[in-house]
Curated annotation (Swiss-Prot):
Keywords: ATP-binding, Isoprene biosynthesis, Kinase, Nucleotide-binding, Transferase. It comes from the Bacteria. Catalyzes the phosphorylation of the position 2 hydroxy group of 4-diphosphocytidyl-2C-methyl-D-erythritol. InterPro entries: GHMP_kinase_C_sf (IPR036554), GHMP_kinase_N_dom (IPR006204), IspE (IPR004424), Ribosomal_Su5_D2-typ_SF (IPR020568), Ribsml_uS5_D2-typ_fold_subgr (IPR014721). Belongs to the GHMP kinase family. IspE subfamily. This is 4-diphosphocytidyl-2-C-methyl-D-erythritol kinase. It is an enzyme of class 2 (transferase). The gene is ispE.
Amino acid sequence: MVENIGSGSAELVSYAKLNLYLDVLGKRSDGYHEIVGLFQTISLHDTLTVEICDRGFYLESSVALPSDNTIKRAWEMFRKNTGKEFGLKVTLKKEIPVGSGLGGGSSNAAAVLRYLGEVFKIPLEDLLNIAAQVGSDVPFFLYGGTALVRGRGEIVEKLEDIEGYSVDLFFPGIHSSTKEMYLSLTPEMYRKGPGRVEELHRAYLERNYEKIKELSYNVFEKVFLEKHPEVMDGLRNFGDGSIVKMMTGSGSVFFALYPLDKGNYSFVGGV
């Protein structure tokens, strides 16, 4: 979502995502892991104010970010792939916790790419190629809503958006390293999920709560809880009466799924 706010600036909304399903199928020859997942954006979001300038990159953030952050990489990869020369000023108001599995960094990058694509008239197909160079989850965020995601995250099949659900989130205050979590997986852990992602999507559309509970899966959840058993104490009092309670991404946030608007954050549709 882009809103012009005057003086050449624009305000961008950058939504968080949940993994309603996430499994690892194996390790690829390029070092990445092959995944399959059902991704969904939710109303929790960061806000970015962006302004194109003559040269340089300037970022003011409400939380500390590394110098090689995804927003800067998005700007660099966009310039490299399009040949456009310009600078960028960004002010980031963070609401999505860092290291939570909610995809905040990837979402920020996608929001910037989408904005630059509109400004410079770059087709979505080209933006998707740039997004894959920035990060594995970035292509999904160019679509948002509900999608089947495969490959290392760059293969995105837009699905009918799921509506009428909400979630509460439990953040245990632990920064979960995606790289460390992938390194913790062993071949015996691959392909352990039900694998019926399209069926899970259909269960959401049909409001088949028992089937949702049966087919929901995250390969990283068991690994994360083995590393951080203290999190179980907080989870015991979280998500009473929910349809399903599970972790998103490689951690550390857990979500409790509810029908309609019982939860604090609603499902958000895509483009």
